[in-house]
Amino acid sequence: MAHIDVFKGWADSLRSDIEAYKSLLESSKADDHSRKLAGAALLYLVSRMDLIPDWNEGIGVIDDVMILRVCAQLTQSHDRGALPTQAEISLERMANEADKIVQFLGSSLYDKLKAHAAKLAEQAVKGRSPAQLMEDAAMRKALYSELEDELKRSVPIVVNDPTDAELRLKAYLTHKLQ
């Protein structure tokens, strides 16, 4: 199976992935690093300044699902606290799936993607930072509403030429992560 097909398949679990991150963001038992990474992952999904524009045919959503997996892997080195079982399962699955990104990008480019994802924990999107989301229920509610709108607008990812899509995906990431 082509890498792009694996990445495409990750979009199928987007709703449960978002729910897992919401659980982590709201957890009073998780450490601040984990919660900020959760906020960063969710904010990335509504950001218009992501690595690959969402309108880019076939690959526009792939960076979104990649960032979810990289952030999940980053949370493994922090205390996520006691989460609902389904959230824990989803976060561990995503963290394990990040290995597929390493296989596709190679360790050097993956390390740049990982560094980019880590920096997102300190960046505001649409006037909301991950730290603010940890403390402000109204900000979380607004973000969750935007995420729901994004999910409603999402359409199936169509890739007619997997080789071309993989080349474009790697080219975008190589260029943006210099």
Q: Which sequence ranges carry the predicted segments?
A:
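N-terminal leader/targeting segments and the first structural element of proteins
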Residues: 1-44
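Conserved GTPase G-domain substructure that encodes guanine base recognition and part of the catalytic core
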Residues: 10, 72, 152
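Alpha-helical structural motif
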Residues: 17, 64-67, 90, 94-97
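A structural signal for well-ordered alpha-helices, especially hydrophobic packing surfaces
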Residues: 22-25, 46-49, 72, 76
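Membrane-inserting effector segments that mediate pore formation, membrane fusion
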Residues: 41-68
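Membrane-interface alpha-helices
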Residues: 58-89
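Intrinsically disordered, low-complexity, charge-dense segments enriched in Lys/Arg
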Residues: 95-178
